[in-house]
Amino acid sequence: MLGVIADIHGNAWAFEAVVADAYHRGVSEFVDLGDVLYGPLAPKKTFELLRQIKLVAQVQGNQDRLILKGPGTPTLDWVRCDLGEEPLSWLAALPSIATYGDCLLCHGTPYSDTTYLLEDVSAGFARVRSEHEIENLLGSTEAPRILCGHSHVQRMVRLTSGRTIVNPGSVGVPAYDDDAPVRHVMESFSPHADTRQLKAPQSLFITSSMTGTLQR
């Protein structure tokens, strides 16, 4: 069985829980849809955990790209320092799109890692795109199954053409707000796709978003 993961954002503890649950449910191999290591929690530990699973395909996300090429900020400087040379070289080698079987993997759309494939946020909230909009964003892509991330929202859309698009949501950051391309909020909810949402133990929470300090 194949597990689809996306948007871990350096949250190693959430990643551990998701992988454990996946193994319990019979998952034996994974594909990852990007934005793996960016975030002020535990990027190096996340990288080490990722190397322990059977990862059969992976793509680079927009914030993976930011780690490699973005301007210096306190968070980026800390992430780069925590990761070191090997994870950065590994990250740089990831493709922007990939295929696995009859699935096409991308972070945002097949042509942009910063565009939401299934949601329009021009009004400040997530509106599910029309089929016409989705088809336009897919362009010449012919894969019968498209796996995407970026929005952090679990969603599955079946097109009248017979194609299926699945966003598994985010392992590490299930909801967030952003100001690009406009100010908007992304919220998680129960999807129609066969996905999983896990609740963290109450005894474990983050007390510092910059250092990832844990309070037990």
Residue spans of the language-model regions?
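Active-site-proximal beta-strand elements of phosphoester/diester hydrolases
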Residues: 1-9, 102-111, 165-169
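Generic structural signal for secondary-structure transition and capping sites
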Residues: 55-58, 96, 103, 213
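Core catalytic region of metal-dependent phosphoesterases/phosphodiesterases
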Residues: 3-92
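Active-site environment of divalent metal-dependent phosphoester hydrolases
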Residues: 9-14, 38-41, 64-69, 111-113, ...
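His/acidic metal-ligating clusters that form di-metal
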Residues: 25-26, 85-156
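Acidic, His/Gly-rich catalytic cores of divalent-metal-dependent hydrolytic chemistry
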Residues: 158-216
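Structural motif
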Residues: 57, 104, 145, 163-165
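Glycine-rich, phosphate-binding/catalytic loops in enzymes
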Residues: 21-22, 47-50, 75, 122-123, ...
